[in-house]
Amino acid sequence: MGRRRKLDPSRQRIARNVAVFRAARGYTQHELGQLAGLHRTFIGAVERAEVNVSIDNVDRIALALSVDPVELLAPQQP
């Protein structure tokens, strides 16, 4: 059995925010991937906090979601 790794808080914020913004716009992971020029499996991995996302891909995802890239790193609002 593999060793469990503690998830990075920034990666978790990006995962949650991408999923929230995507759902709010009614996009599937496939649709967001197409808009961002990324594969749907990569979008899924981002939303599960399984990958470190490059700043270039944060920019691509933010542009596809029509948000400022910094919003993908913002803490969850109450």
Regions found by a protein language model. Give the residues of each.
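Conserved hydrophobic/aromatic packing and binding residues within compact polymer-binding modules
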Residues: 18, 32-33, 43-46, 72
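Recognition helix of helix-turn-helix/homeodomain-like DNA-binding domains
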Residues: 37-51
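Conserved amphipathic alpha-helical interaction elements at protein-protein interfaces in regulatory
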Residues: 20, 24, 64-67, 78
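Short basic helix-loop element that most often maps to the first helix and adjoining turn
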Residues: 16-35, 60
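DNA major-groove recognition helix of helix-turn-helix/homeodomain DNA-binding modules
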Residues: 54-71
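Short, charged recognition helix plus adjacent turn
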Residues: 1-3, 63, 73-78
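A short, Lys/Arg-rich alpha-helix, primarily the initiator
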Residues: 2-24
